[in-house]
């Protein structure tokens, strides 16, 4: 299994099972509107950090902050009921 798919599956599982102490659960347990707002705020923060790292030409920081950005985007997608397969299909359409 590819690592991104594995992370996505873990996020989906945590949203569903709500294990105590999970960061994903902390982000997603409010009502949907509040949870989405909270997640979007994190995505905005992480996007800004990627931009700063890129402007500083700091490769390690770009990688680190991009992983945070991708993770929080995956949380948003999963909270919105979008599967990894649906996202993959969209990428496949764009490869033509």
Curated annotation (Swiss-Prot):
One of its GO terms (cellular component) is cytoplasm. Keywords: Amino-acid biosynthesis, ATP-binding, Cytoplasm, Histidine biosynthesis, Hydrolase, Nucleotide-binding. This is Phosphoribosyl-ATP pyrophosphatase. Pathway: Amino-acid biosynthesis; L-histidine biosynthesis; L-histidine from 5-phospho-alpha-D-ribose 1-diphosphate: step 2/9. One of its GO terms (biological process) is L-histidine biosynthetic process. It is found in: Cytoplasm. Its EC number is 3.6.1.31. HAMAP family: HisE. It comes from the Archaea. It catalyses: 1-(5-phospho-beta-D-ribosyl)-ATP + H2O = 1-(5-phospho-beta-D-ribosyl)-5'-AMP + diphosphate + H(+).
